[in-house]
Amino acid sequence: MLIAGVRQDVPLTGFLNPRTNQIEGFDVEFIKAITRAIFGDESKVDLRPVTAAARIPSLQDGSVDMVAAAMTITADRKNQIDFSEVYYQAGDRVLVKGDASYNSIQDLGGKRVCTVKGSTAEQNIPGASPQVEVVQADTYNECLLSLQQGRVDAVSTDDVILSGLAQQDPSTKLVGPKFSDEPYGIGVAKGHPEFVAFINGVIQQMKSDGRWKAAYDSWFGRFAGPAPEPPPGTYSN
């Protein structure tokens, strides 16, 4: 049995489906493919919910074998864990109420912008707009609720995550261009190069045989349009 850390609070990417009580999403498609490649049966996996802040610790303490949880590959994180090649290229944008006049992160100087603890957006937001007041939350749903209740002026994180929040609340809208590059990778504890290489092989096959495009179209296509080309294989450890 494979144990995989996933998000359960990120619509379209990794979320708990209330109808099935199963965790689903774009990230989960990669976990299923890896599990199927190992065992011949995609059900032989235990999906363990993790928060953004718990992704790396859960690998380091052996709670999970891998993490596929909208996790950006960064130099600092690569010092702590190993990563697969890039399986999705995201970028930070901004989510605001539909009647708001903000058009970019730069318009939010002096305003309150929510993001999740342990996310790369914590650093990216001040870098893009230094006068923003960053408000931290444990989950993106908490950020969305704060926006709905007027406690913050915007939510900022990866574009695909914001697309999922906008799906939940059609009275919100995404604005502005991406102001960061967020290459997603699957995390593995240090010291398992063969496992990383195996995961890379599965990702590469998905990119070449159409499964990557099918996963993108299934989860993001209605909100983000046709699938782009899969990202090239980079960020080897």
Each model region followed by its residue ranges:
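Extracytoplasmic small-molecule ligand-binding "clamshell" domains
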Residues: 1-67
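Extended ligand-binding regions for polar small-molecule ligands
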Residues: 28-29, 36-38, 119, 186-224
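A ligand-binding cleft/hinge motif common to bilobed small-molecule-binding domains
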Residues: 54, 70-79, 124-127, 141, ...
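Periplasmic-binding protein-like
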Residues: 88-96, 159, 163-203, 222-237
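Short loop->beta-strand "edge-of-pocket" segments that line small-molecule binding or catalytic clefts
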Residues: 3-6, 24, 105-119
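Acidic, polar ligand-binding/catalytic clefts
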Residues: 32, 44-107
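Beta->alpha turn/N-cap motifs
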Residues: 6-10, 48-53, 62-74, 98, ...
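Hydrophobic residues within well-ordered alpha-helices
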Residues: 34, 59-60, 108, 147-148, ...
